[in-house]
Amino acid sequence: MGQKVHPNGIRLGIVKPWNSTWFANTKEFADNLDSDFKVRQFLTKELAKASVSRIVIERPAKSIRVTIHTARPGIVIGKKGEDVEKLRKVVADIAGVPAQINIAEVRKPELDAKLVADSITSQLERRVMFRRAMKRAVQNAMRLGAKGIKVEVSGRLGGAEIARTEWYREGRVPLHTLRADIDYNTSEAHTTYGVIGVKVWIFKGEILGGMAAVEQPEPAAQPKKQQRKGRK
C-alpha cells in the first residue's frame, strides 16, 4: 500500500515554520521539550472552546513567549484581560521561567485545517450527518478562496457495524509539490458509537521564494491602502 508523509513535516523550513522556535544545549533540550508539551497540553485543554488553531512557543533569554492563534480572541483574553493573566501565571509555573502570552487572531477560520476539523467533529458529536458536515466545510473553504480542499472521515459512520472511510475533495490538493501551501490537521469526534477520525487538507496556493516569502507576507500590503485613500 502507498504511504503518505506528513504534509506539514515535509514542508518545515521550506514553506512551513516550526511551532517551537528556540535553541538549547544538550542538558536543557529535554527539559524545554517536556515543558513545551505540558504548556500545549494545558492550553489546549483550557481553551477547548476558544477555537485555537496553533500554539507557537519561543524562548528568548531565559523566558517563554507563547503566541496563541485563535478565531475567538475575546474568549481567550477574557474581561479586562483577566483570563490571559491566569493563563500566563500557570504557563510560568509549568515552564519555570517568566512567561508572556500573545494572542493572534485567525481571520478566516474556514481556511484553517485545525478549525475546520474541529468544526466537523463538533457537528458529528451533535449527530449531524457526516456527509452534510463534510460538504458544508468544503463549500465554505472554496467560497473563501481555497484552491482545493480534501476532507476524510473514518470510523463507524452513521452508527454502522463495520467501520469505513469516506472522503470528499474539491479543487487541487498537490501533496508532492513542496512549494504548495497545504494546511493539514486532524481531530477526533467521540460519539456514542465510538471515535470518528477527521482529516483535513487545505491547499491555499503556491509560495514562491521559500521561507523569506512566508515570514513577511503582510507589510507589503499596507502602503497600497494608503495610496488608495490618497487617490480618493
UniProtKB/Swiss-Prot annotation:
Domain KH type-2: 39-107
Annotated Gene Ontology cellular component terms: cytosolic small ribosomal subunit
A Pfam cross-reference name: KH_2
Keywords: Ribonucleoprotein, Ribosomal protein, RNA-binding, rRNA-binding
Keyword Magnesium included in the entry's annotation: no
PROSITE patterns per UniProt: KH_TYPE_2 (PS50823), RIBOSOMAL_S3 (PS00548)
GO molecular function, one term: structural constituent of ribosome
InterPro entries xref list: KH_dom, KH_dom-like_a/b, KH_dom_type_2, KH_sf_prok-type, Ribosomal_S3_C_sf, Ribosomal_uS3_bac-typ, Ribosomal_uS3_C, Ribosomal_uS3_CS
Source superkingdom: Bacteria
Family to which this protein belongs: Belongs to the universal ribosomal protein uS3 family.
Known role: Binds the lower part of the 30S subunit head. Binds mRNA in the 70S ribosome, positioning it for translation.
Quaternary organization: Part of the 30S ribosomal subunit. Forms a tight complex with proteins S10 and S14.
Official protein name in the record: Small ribosomal subunit protein uS3
Species assigned in the record: Erwinia tasmaniensis (strain DSM 17950 / CFBP 7177 / CIP 109463 / NCPPB 4357 / Et1/99)
